């Protein structure tokens, strides 16, 4: 069997205490919800935690006025940090692994455990934390760095590959000329990309609602059959299908599901702006994404692009 958090908060605190048997590990119990009165544990290392962040977290939890925590830690997260409805980037990182939670504690972060939830909430969180995978630390240093760099490159390609291609389909290095569009399709490229984005989400939702024994065969068969007939019918270019297949697979390299959709929305904005204003729209889209990340703040008010702990 493998160690992991469960729905009982007492067991979860014990799993963390087994790994850190130090007097500086503090677990403060409180509760939220006027009706549910759900137990909450605020865990931190007293000699490493950012005191300002800790005070901020405590004050936010104490000032909560909600009836219950219907969705456990997700309800708590939304109540603690009410972000704008148009902001898709996650402000909290969740993990079901005690080793990951303990590693974050030793880095000076705050862990919040909610009763009836098998996940731990990690604060503060930056975009770099979202694309980081816990398994990277179980490999040698060179391998771990390679996986991190590869994931970062794939993340960038996921956002910019299709908009760059849409901006100038003929602008391809000689060694990659085999990827150039040769089929004459009446459907504009931008519509092809947007339709395929919707189709990929449709296949993903279908796989989620399909019995587990059939989900994988259904995804493979549906993707192959629909892709083949979509190209043969003249609706899509085969090259466009290739790029969108890469994007679809690259989305699964994101450890955080919510971050994958945030990157998807940024890619859609870039696609639309590039289609309307060409290279000017692409530059405006890049500037918009950059400003969005720069002015996006974490729970402690720090920059979302990076976090420096005490």
Where would I find each of the regions flagged by the language model?
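Cytosolic regulatory modules rich in charged/polar residues
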Residues: 1-189, 301-310
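Hydrophobic alpha-helical transmembrane segments of membrane transport and translocation systems
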Residues: 238-310
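Transmembrane alpha-helical segments that form the functional core of multipass membrane systems
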Residues: 119, 125-270
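Conserved, well-folded catalytic cores of nucleic-acid-processing
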Residues: 19-23, 60-67, 104, 108, ...
């Amino acid at each position: 069997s493998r160690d992991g958090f469960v729905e009982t908060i007492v067991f979860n605190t014990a799993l963390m205490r087994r790994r850190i048997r130090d007097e500086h590990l503090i677990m403060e119990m409180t509760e939220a919800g006027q009706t549910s009165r759900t137990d909450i544990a605020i865990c931190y290392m007293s000699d490493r935690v950012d005191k300002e962040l800790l005070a901020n977290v405590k004050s936010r939890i104490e000032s909560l006025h909600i009836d219950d925590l219907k969705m456990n830690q997700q309800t708590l997260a939304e109540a603690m940090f009410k972000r704008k409805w148009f902001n898709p980037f996650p402000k909290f990182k969740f993990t079901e692994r005690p080793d990951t939670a303990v590693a974050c504690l030793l880095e000076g972060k705050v862990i919040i455990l909610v009763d009836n939830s098998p996940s731990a909430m990690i604060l503060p969180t930056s975009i770099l934390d979202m694309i980081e995978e816990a398994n990277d630390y179980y490999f040698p240093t060179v391998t771990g760095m390679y996986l991190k760099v590869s994931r970062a490159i794939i993340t960038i390609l996921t956002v910019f590959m299709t908009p760059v291609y849409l901006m100038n389909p003929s602008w391809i290095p000689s060694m990659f000329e085999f990827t150039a569009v040769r089929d004459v399709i009446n459907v504009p490229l931008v519509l092809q990309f947007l339709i395929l984005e919707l189709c990929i989400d449709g296949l993903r939702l279908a796989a989620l609602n399909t019995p587990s024994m059939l989900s994988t065969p259904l995804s493979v068969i549906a993707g192959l059959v629909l892709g083949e007939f979509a190209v043969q019918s003249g609706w899509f270019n085969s090259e466009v299908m290739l790029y969108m297949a890469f994007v679809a697979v690259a989305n699964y390299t994101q450890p955080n599901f919510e971050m994958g959709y945030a990157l998807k929305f940024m890619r859609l904005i870039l696609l639309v702006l590039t289609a309307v204003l060409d290279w000017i729209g692409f530059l405006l889209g890049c500037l918009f994404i950059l400003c969005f990340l720069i002015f996006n703040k974490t729970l402690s008010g720090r920059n979302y692009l990076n976090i420096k702990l005490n």
